[in-house]
Amino acid sequence: MDSVFSNVARAPEDPILGVTVAYNNDPSPVKINLGVGAYRTEEGKPLVLDVVRKAEQQLVNDPSRVKEYIPIVGISDFNKLSAKLILGADSPAITESRVTTVQCLSGTGSLRVGAEFLKTHYHQSVIYIPKPTWGNHPKVFNLAGLSVEYFRYYDPATRGLDFKGLLEDLGAAPSGAIVLLHACAHNPTGVDPTSEQWEQIRQLMRSKSLLPFFDSAYQGFASGSLDTDAQSVRTFVADGGECLIAQSYAKNMGLYGERVGALSIVCKSADVASKVESQVKLVVRPMYSSPPIHGASIVATILKSSDMYNNWTIELKEMADRIKSMRQQLFEAIQARGTPGDWSHIIKQIGMFTFTGLNKEQVEFMTKEFHIYMTSDGRISMAGLSSKTVPHLADAMHAAVTRLG
């Protein structure tokens, strides 16, 4: 007898996660995985931060800890500390109780909860997202019932920001449209606006009543400074206007598999923020009821303790500095080989990813001939590189450019 699901078509492999599947199936000893967005040590190993291990040990040793359900909005301390981390301790939004923060399932979950709330309670159902953006963004917003449009962001000719196109497209967006903004370390391009450009974006968006929805996946991971990487968000919050912010602790605390994140919604008044929170609860309750305890407890433990917080900032800067060092080493290795073209974008871009400018054919060539795995758009994770593997990557890029043009 046929299955009632026999007509279900096989879904395509996720383009990013599929890179790792292909990498795992390759027996080559020289293979490199530059596809996945997770930090690796110089030895190519996953890293658990020392401060995270200490926090976990502290939690394990606490006999008063139980495994009861937590509130729909999550752990109160975690929410307060997360808002403080992204907005700044002295933010008027916090002191005036104009922000509601809800613990969610990492960045993706925070985006989805925010999108579901907006679909029901906001007068516009169109969201503008940068072209290109993280591959999951359009799916998250479409499945929440929002209509996705794109605004120009990256200029392949300069391998930098298409600022003119960005302003034109947002200027042409309907009044009140939602706009997704990467708070820092734009994924996949590594290209961020300058602080002056952010101010122009803010002025334009406020003049058209466009609603900012920030995705902050890399705070502290881009520049090495938590405050510097939050400046774009704080610029918008400082004007008293409203916005949404999705936070993730996957990258900056290395808590990838713990799924720890937060959604903050900054409102015009404490009364509105309270009503908004009551409705966000109605989004969460039928979706996953309440969030998990462990990861958020780790984050709250670290953010509450001045010693642990300081240790975290040191480890975070070490990760950011290693990525910057990989950029420099790769740039110098390409220069040394005399590879045609201007490769300065490798050291100008910021954060975990570099948008190399390599095309699909060149990427396929590098995978086949050199066992280097990356997404077909030419994005490479700098965190997956080491001093030992940079020469092999530079050789592959040189061969791809010189042989295929």
UniProtKB/Swiss-Prot annotation:
Catalysed reactions listed for this entry: L-aspartate + 2-oxoglutarate = oxaloacetate + L-glutamate
EC number: 2.6.1.1
Effects seen without this gene: No visible phenotype, but slight modification of the amino acid composition. Growth defect, when grown in vitro.
CDD domains the UniProt entry points to: AAT_like
Disulfide bonds: none
Record note on what altering A250V does: In asp2-12; loss of pyridoxal phosphate binding and loss of activity
N-acetylmethionine sites (modified residues): M1
Protein name: Aspartate aminotransferase, cytoplasmic isozyme 1
